[in-house]
């Protein structure tokens, strides 16, 4: 029978089920060990690849695959999870899909894209780098992609690019 093998070569005794991590085809006398990155419960005729988002963490096809954690992903049949690289994040919280690139004005963290804080900007449009502080006399909103000079009639009175420019009270 499929998933069983005649391991004692005696047609008078019943075939034995193949153990977890192995398989057999109809009429087999031995069970075949599953490849790394796959698993098989007892008595199957095939090994199943760990699905995308799960891994063969212990390289043992007799144990079930386990899910990758937050901010990680893996393709089918993998033996390790991949952490989202800089500039990307696990935006859909699905370890079966690759991490997505963060947009300009933000930077990547493994689980989410974080907008640049007030007074900073993503100067090179590369979400893998940190946000850069604006200079005195300029400001940037949260998630800024550039610093803006204070408009005519306004000044950076507190010299803090994280606060809006103030109107000129001295006129």
How would you describe each model-predicted region?
Residues 1-171:
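Disulfide-rich, cysteine-dense extracellular ectodomains and adjacent flexible linkers of secreted
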């Amino acid at each position: 029978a499929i998933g069983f093998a005649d391991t004692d070569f005696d047609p008078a005794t019943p075939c034995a089920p193949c153990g977890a991590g192995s398989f057999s085809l109809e009429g087999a006398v031995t069970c075949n060990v599953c490849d790394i990155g796959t698993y098989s419960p007892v008595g199957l005729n095939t090994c199943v690849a760990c699905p995308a988002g799960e891994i063969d963490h212990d390289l043992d096809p007799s144990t079930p695959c386990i899910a990758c954690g937050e901010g990680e992903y893996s393709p089918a049949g993998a033996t390790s999870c991949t952490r989202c690289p800089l500039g990307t994040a696990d935006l859909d919280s699905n370890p079966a899909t690759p991490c997505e690139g963060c947009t300009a004005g933000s930077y990547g963290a493994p689980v989410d894209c974080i907008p640049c804080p007030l007074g900073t900007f993503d100067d090179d449009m590369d979400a893998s780098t940190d946000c850069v502080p604006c200079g005195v006399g300029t400001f940037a909103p949260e998630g800024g992609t550039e610093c803006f000079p204070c408009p005519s009639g306004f000044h950076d009175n507190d010299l803090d690019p994280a606060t809006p420019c103030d109107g000129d009270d001295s006129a």
